[in-house]
Amino acid sequence: MNIVGQIKEKMKEEIRQAAVRAGLASADELPDVLLEVPRDKAHGDYSTNIAMQLARIAKKPPRAIAEAIVGQLDRERMSVARIEIAGPGFINFYMDNRYLTAVVPAILQAGQAYGESNVGNGEKVQVEFVSANPTGDLHLGHARGAAVGDSLCNILAKAGFDVTREYYINDAGKQIYNLAKSVEARYFQALGVDMPLPEDGYYGDDIVEIGKKLAEEYGDRFVEMEEEERLAFFRDYGLRYELEKIKKDLADFRVPFDVWYSETSLYESGKIDEALSTLRERGYIYEQDGATWFRSTAFGDDKDRVLIKQDGTYTYLLPDIAYHQDKLRRGFKKLINIWGADHHGYIPRMKAAIAALGYDPEALEVEIIQMVNLYQNGERVKMSKRTGKAVTMRELMEEVGVDAVRYFFAMRSGDTHLDFDMDLAVSQSNENPVYYVQYAHARVSSILRQAEEQHISYDGDLALHHLVETEKEIELLKVLGDFPDVVAEAALKRMPHRVTAYAFDLASALHSFYNAEKVLDLDNIEKTKARLALVKAVQITLQNALALIGVSAPEQM
């Protein structure tokens, strides 16, 4: 049960009814009532600008409208202690904090389900993320996309969406041919034959390793084999090796997928031809200069796009169009793609393709993930000390730990550049946000253990009577009560960093409460049991928040 959400809905409904009772507008004319939390606590717990919104309809000054609304409000029904009109007509509400007493029992009853809502209404959403080429190690951009994507999936599911997590395997096209040729070169080199890597080949240590494994496992079996047959084997072997490595890295990063979708399957199933036929039937395909073109300018793209080149090979766009047609045919109402910043220009042509196929282009949402810069000892880390190459996701996980990487990567909006301070990420200090938040969980766990050792249990019913007496209790209760709304907002606005910020705010409120108040007071067992219930509610909520962003909640540190 979302106590704070229910109160806010009651307040909005009461404001709507008050406006109608005051004769300012009919129910049909009323705009949505917005309740904001003022930055300055002196301006109340909530504020609305409804008077300004109604000025045009009511044909009155906003301040006069505000006075008319306030005169019609039922404070008791709204759990409001007092109301003030400020500035040009803002209505500020100061809450009667007694409503907060129900927050703790609600959290204790809900447990792991606290924070769930049905704002998604079971809508089928597909989130496609990471989708790195299976030709080498996952890098930091992939890691950030994985952290943001997985957190978003968790949050969407918590908010009542039916979520499918999907990884698109780019296992067709030129890059896979280059993978096979690179494996071939490394295989022959492992046998002592000097074969150069192709110009567009892959130079990673993993390809060297694949070549050695093939030489050890099969000896010179492939030397006399026809090149086409040999490359087909090396392609499959290399793909399998790289995919297994990617899957292992993502599993260790706590990022699961429901579907691993092969690009090759689009060719084998005829889905590429189907997409091309659909576009042709709808009049968006034409031939020019020996190539096949998609008339994407009909949907606002800056130029038409080639789908089939003069030599008969496909551009990247055609299988991507077929893939998105397949997604929509599977019944997804929203397609959320999490792409690197280098794909920004690709968005208009994909939306154009979806529209040309006969679907709503707004079904596609693209979240852009910006670059990550690593810093250590105050200097930017450009290359791995161990390999002399770009730092991989695996190396960063091993260097600073999964919790730190997941938290830091989910801490900012994905479309902003991120500077990752490796020294800060491993420091045991309050300046390290992941340490600060996890320490809050360890602290409440320690309090609950101490209480158990003294045979004192928490009591949610006592929380109804003993928990709105001090400023720090009230602040902590307010933050606890906000969690379901934060999750719902993070889901609807696709902002996983809102949950990370919430976890930090809750930890901060807990530390402030702990420093100001005594929890275990043997001279006042009733208050102790009530405060233990509050501490238990913090533990549950912190666990739930951290689980959404893939971070552990340690009981001891």
Swiss-Prot record:
This chain belongs to the protein called Arginine--tRNA ligase
Q: Which reaction does it catalyse?
A: tRNA(Arg) + L-arginine + ATP = L-arginyl-tRNA(Arg) + AMP + diphosphate
Origin: domain of life: Bacteria
Chief localization class? cytoplasm
Motif 'HIGH' region: residue span?
132-142
UniProt cross-references to InterPro entries, sorted A to Z: aa-tRNA-synth_I_CS (IPR001412), Arg-tRNA-ligase (IPR001278), Arg-tRNA-synth_N (IPR005148), Arg-tRNA-synth_N_sf (IPR036695), ArgRS_core (IPR035684), DALR_anticod-bd (IPR008909), Rossmann-like_a/b/a_fold (IPR014729), tRNAsynth_Ia_anticodon-bd (IPR009080)
Taxonomic path: Bacteria, Bacillati, Bacillota, Bacilli, Bacillales
Give any GO molecular function from the UniProt entry: ATP binding
Q: Which SUPFAM superfamilies match?
A: Anticodon-binding domain of a subclass of class I aminoacyl-tRNA synthetases, Arginyl-tRNA synthetase (ArgRS), N-terminal 'additional' domain, Nucleotidylyl transferase
Q: Which gene encodes it?
A: argS
